[in-house]
């Protein structure tokens, strides 16, 4: 009787392990896809930021254009 219980428990553990391995592989594929998508989005954001900076003049004057502060 003890052997049947041990065999059933072992079979259950092997089954769970197989499902866990499948789940881990699926999660790995998902994480890898998300990392690639995030890298693309970072590049896209960087390009948009550069375009925005290039297209809008800055409201802050450069130090050469600033008038010197009054001296007291």
From Swiss-Prot:
Membrane spanning stretches: none
Extent of the signal sequence: none
Cited InterPro entries: SlyX
Tree of life domain: Bacteria
Biased composition (Polar residues): 55-65
Pfam families: SlyX
Region (Disordered): 52-72
Alphabetized PANTHER family for the sequence: PROTEIN SLYX
Family, per entry: Belongs to the SlyX family.
Descriptive protein name: Protein SlyX
Organism: Citrobacter koseri (strain ATCC BAA-895 / CDC 4225-83 / SGSC4696)
Gene name linked to the record: slyX
